Amino acid sequence: MLTEKMFFKNIAECGKNKRRKGGRKMYVGKKVTRVDAYDKVIGRTRYTDDLCDKGAYVARILHSTIANGKVVSIDTTEAEKIPGVVKVCTCFDLKEKHYFPTAGHPWSTDESHQDVADRLVLTDRVRFYGDDIAAVIAEDEVSAAQALRAIKVEYEEYPFVLDVHEAMKDGAPQLHENYPNNILKHTTIRKGNYEEAIKEPGLIKVEGWYSTPPVQHCHIENFICYAEKEAERIKIVSSTQIPHIVRRVCGQALGIDWGKIRIIKPYIGGGFGNKQDVLYEPLCAWLCLQVGGHLVKLDVPREETFVSTRVRHAIHSHIVSWVRPDGTFVARKLEAFSDQGAYASHGHSICAKGVGAFPQLYPCENVEADAYTVFTNKSV
C-alpha cells in the first residue's frame, strides 16, 4: 500500500537524480512518480461536481421525441408553475442564431479547412430522436425533472432515414441543404492500376462486408459543466478534454469575443474521445445568461449520454482482395461508409483516417479506396 510517507520519499528520490548543466534533471531511466497519483489514490482529487457551489441552479434538457421534423410550438405554462422552477427556455427564445461547430480540432483561418458549423444551443429543426429543443433551470433536480414532464411540444414530422445506404439514394430525406444524397464528404485513394491488375489469370477473389457498431464511451463521470458570470467574463468549468477549443466554440455560439470566455478543466473521470467534442458548454453558458449570470450547473444523466452526447461512429466496409495462390496480394479495393448521425461533429476525419490506413495494411501495389461520411437521423 502506498502511504503518504512512501509517496514523498519517492519524490525525494527523484530529486536526487544527477543534474545536467543548467540545472535540468535527468529523468531517462529513472522512476518518476505521477504528480497526480497520490491525490487520486487517497480520494482527495476533486472533480467538476465537487467544485460547484451548492447555490447553483440546476439545468435539465428537453430532448425531441421524433427523429426528423420541426418544432411547431412549445407550451411551458404548466412547467413554469412548478415550485422551484426558475426559468424555462426554448428554441424560440434564441434572439440570434449563432451556428457553431463542435469538433475538437484546431481552428483554421482558411474557411475550406474549418469544421462544419451546424449546431445551435437549442434548435427547432429536429434531426434525431434526442435533439435539444428546450431547457429548464430550477433550484433543485426534482423541480427540474417535474418541469420537463410538464412541457408540451407540437411537432411537424418529416420522413427519416436510419441507414447510410438508404440515405445516399435519390429521394431520401435530406438532413442538410448543402449535402446532396446526405454525403458530408467523399475522398479517394488510388495506387497503381486496380482494373488492369485484376485481369491477371489465376487470381483468387476474397470479398466481404465488415461492420463496426456504434459504441458509447461509458466513462464513469458523465458529462458535467457549470457556468456563471464573473465580472465581464463568463466562467465555465467543464469535464472536457479540449478546454481551449471549448473556449473558442462557446464564443462562437454566444456571438461574443473568445476573450470574454474563461474555461477551467478539473480532473475528469474518463473521456475516451466523448469529451473531445464540445458538448453542452455553450448551452450551459447561454442558460447562465438567461438568469442574470447566476451559477447554473448542467449534469447530464447516464440515460441521456447514450442518446445525446457522442458515440464512436458505425462504419460499414466492403473489401475486395485479389490474391495469388501463393498468398501475395495483387489488388485490393475498399468502400467504407461512416454513419455520421445527424450533425457533422468531427466530420469526415474519422472515416478518412481509417481509410487512409488501408493501403498500409498489406504489401500491395494496386489499391482503390473510397471513404464516404453520410448523415442519418441518428445520434452523432
PLM segments and residue spans:
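Gly/Pro-rich active-site capping loops and adjacent beta-alpha segments
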Residues: 30, 143-163, 244-246, 304-380
